[in-house]
């Protein structure tokens, strides 16, 4: 099974956001074990680096990003995907639309997110971490 993991799931882990962190950690562990193939969208990486700046030093953030790249595959972003996302006016959030473009590219079975309503028009099935963990 292949999934694209939304940025908020990774933030749940690194910021230990209760009660979401445990389900997020379970998903990450399944990716580490190779039970599922996990992807992050390319733009998730700089977003994480920026958002985590208040909680982690630059050195720590670099190590976290390096470790993420060992666990997850990274879906590329190119001009074609960006233009496709820009033209989808039915997606209110441009960043979510980019995530969906990346999920389509990698043939993901699911986009795992805590914000499923943001993906109502997604071509890929969307699932919450809790519901995804129940599938495992």
Task: Give the ranges of each region predicted by the language model.
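Short, well-structured N-terminal submotif of metal-dependent ribonuclease cores
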Residues: 1-39, 53-60, 121, 135-136
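Acidic, PIN/NYN-like endoribonuclease modules and their adjacent C-terminal/linker elements
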Residues: 2, 104-136
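Short, flexible helix/strand-to-coil boundary loops that buttress conserved ligand/catalytic motifs
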Residues: 14, 86-89, 123
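Active-site-proximal, substrate-binding regions of enzyme catalytic domains
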Residues: 25, 45-47, 52-73, 80
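Active-site neighborhoods of divalent-metal-dependent phosphate/nucleic-acid chemistry enzymes
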Residues: 73-116
């Amino acid at each position: 099974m292949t999934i694209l993991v939304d940025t908020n799931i990774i933030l749940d882990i690194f910021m230990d956001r209760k009660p979401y962190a445990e389900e997020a950690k379970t998903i990450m562990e399944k990716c580490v074990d190779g039970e599922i193939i996990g992807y992050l969208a390319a733009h998730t990486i700089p977003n994480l680096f920026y958002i985590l700046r208040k909680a982690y030093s630059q050195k720590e953030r670099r190590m976290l990003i390096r470790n993420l790249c060992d666990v997850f595959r990274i879906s590329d972003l190119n001009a074609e995907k960006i233009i496709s996302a820009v033209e989808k006016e039915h997606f209110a959030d441009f960043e979510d639309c980019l995530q969906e473009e990346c999920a389509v590219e990698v043939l993901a079975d699911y986009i795992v997110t805590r914000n499923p309503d943001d993906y109502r028009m997604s071509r890929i099935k969307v699932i919450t971490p809790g519901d995804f963990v129940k599938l495992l």
